[in-house]
Regions:
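Beta-sandwich strand segments
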Residues: 152-162, 401-409
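Membrane-proximal low-complexity regions enriched in glycine and acidic/polar residues
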Residues: 64-157
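Juxtamembrane interface at the cytosolic side of transmembrane helices
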Residues: 204-242
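Short beta-strand and strand-turn-strand segments in soluble, beta-rich domains
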Residues: 52-55, 100-116, 336-352
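N-terminal edge beta-strand
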Residues: 41-70, 282-290
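Internal/C-terminal transmembrane anchor helices
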Residues: 233-261
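Short, aromatic-rich amphipathic segments at membrane interfaces
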Residues: 162-198
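C-terminal soluble domains/tails of integral membrane proteins
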Residues: 262-420
């Protein structure tokens, strides 16, 4: 290596140090607030309203100590009016949305069956889930239930704030291996991971540095465009390429053999699919047909006209309309509302014309209004600009005995600027 190359490397090093120092100074001087929650609002309203419809969600307890167990439970319905622009849930995985691994997920069940790989879900049916979480990082965290659907991406459900107290240093995650040895997954092979990061980063830096120290990328590109690659076929390049290729293969093979000798019994990543039967269809005497819907833009209100038929033996009354995790309730719905459900997702602006119950055997046209600023806060009014301007949600009714009936409703929605 000649003096010119050494000087070039020195200048590049100074540039790198200057950029690093400037970046550090910016992070120390500029006050950047961390993003804490509500990324789900960036998802399209038609995806949140008409794909997976969540209900009966619970987050317990409100405060969990490090190493203690918390749970997320609830149910979800796969809407019959599944959007055409969204991939069907033929391959779906139940997940948890959180700001980094603040909890460790211990187990997930769908309809009581352990679920740790993806599988098909049935449109038009319901599933009940339970997730057990072990508290890891202290703080106040926004926790979502979530379903990842192939060709559709993550579909986030409503979220609640879960608090973790204690010290992160006290966290442990012990498991027993097939050989009977107990290890702590929080710290197991940490030094080994650091070692391999250094090895591969070092090899990559050496590979790039070998070409940076010689004629730079831009001159090589100009020569290639002007004269072809004959002038660039340097014997040193071939020797260097073969040396790095052999070294890479040796590292991969050696690392594999070492791992086999240290850990002879391993379980491969599972590539099958989990087939979970949906919940049985509960008897529902209420039939609903949406005939008209509009969204009052200045009034922030969704108005729906429906034909409701009561085929049961008892009077039924509308109490709740839930969509995209937002629950619009009236007095009846409030009486059945879980007091621990996030207050920021509850709106009391549900009204029904007449407030008269639907009698057994009666078919009646009902006009419902769900009005609240949450349409704007949750960015659901953007459905007017969606490729499918349709709404969707779950309408809940109760009979005199307190039995709840759930109907998934959907329909085209028209924007208006005056009450029609």
């Amino acid at each position: 290596m000649n003096i010119k190359s050494i000087l070039k490397l020195g200048v590049l090093g100074l540039y790198g140090a200057a950029i690093g120092a400037a970046s550090l100074a910016v992070t120390l001087v500029v006050d950047v607030a961390p993003a804490a929650a509500h990324g789900e609002r960036s998802q399209e309203p038609f995806l949140r309203m008409r794909s997976i419809q969540w209900y009966d969600l619970k987050w317990q307890p409100k405060v969990t100590k490090v190493n203690d167990i918390a749970t997320m439970t609830g149910k979800f319905h796969l809407a019959e009016d599944w959007p055409r622009a969204v991939g069907k849930p033929e391959r779906a995985f139940f997940n948890v949305g959180s700001p980094s691994p603040v909890f460790v997920r211990l187990s997930t069940t769908l309809n009581g069956e352990p679920t740790f790989i993806s599988g098909p879900l049935v449109i038009g049916r319901d599933y009940e889930f339970e997730v057990k979480l072990k508290a890891r990082i202290p703080g106040r965290h926004h926790m979502h239930a979530m379903v990842n659907v192939k060709d559709a991406g993550p579909i986030a459900g409503p979220a609640a704030w879960m608090n973790i107290s204690g010290s992160w240093d006290d966290f442990t995650n012990p498991v027993t291996t097939l050989t009977g040895k107990t290890i702590d997954l929080e710290t197991f092979n940490f030094s080994n991971g650091i070692f391999w990061h250094i090895v591969w980063l070092g090899l990559g830096c050496f590979w790039i540095g070998a070409f940076v120290a010689r004629p730079m990328f831009l001159p090589r590109s100009r020569v290639l465009l002007a004269y072809g690659d004959e002038l660039l076929l340097d014997p040193f390049d071939r020797k260097l390429g073969w040396a790095v290729a052999i070294l890479t293969c040796a590292l991969v093979w050696g690392g594999y053999r070492y791992t086999e000798s240290v850990h002879p019994y391993t379980v491969p990543i599972q590539a099958g699919e989990s087939k979970v039967e949906p919940m049985p269809i509960a008897p529902n005497p209420v039939a609903i047909k949406v005939t008209h819907a509009n969204y009052d833009v200045p009034g922030r209100a969704l108005r729906v006209t429906m034909e409701i038929t009561n085929n049961g033996d008892s009077e039924v009354n509308i109490g709740e309309f839930t969509t995209a995790g937002v629950r619009f309730v009236n007095k009846l719905g409030q009486s059945h509302l879980d007091p621990d459900y996030p207050r920021e997702l509850v709106a009391t602006g549900l009204t029904v014309d007449g407030d008269k119950g639907i009698q057994p055997g009666e078919t009646r046209e009902v006009k419902m209004e769900a009005k609240d600023a949450l349409w704007e806060v949750q960015r659901l009014m953007a459905l007017l600009g969606d490729p499918e301007s349709r709404f969707g949600g779950l309408l809940m009714t109760w009979d005199a005995q307190g039995n709840r009936y759930i109907n998934s409703i959907a329909g085209a929605v028209i924007p208006v600027f005056t009450k029609l």
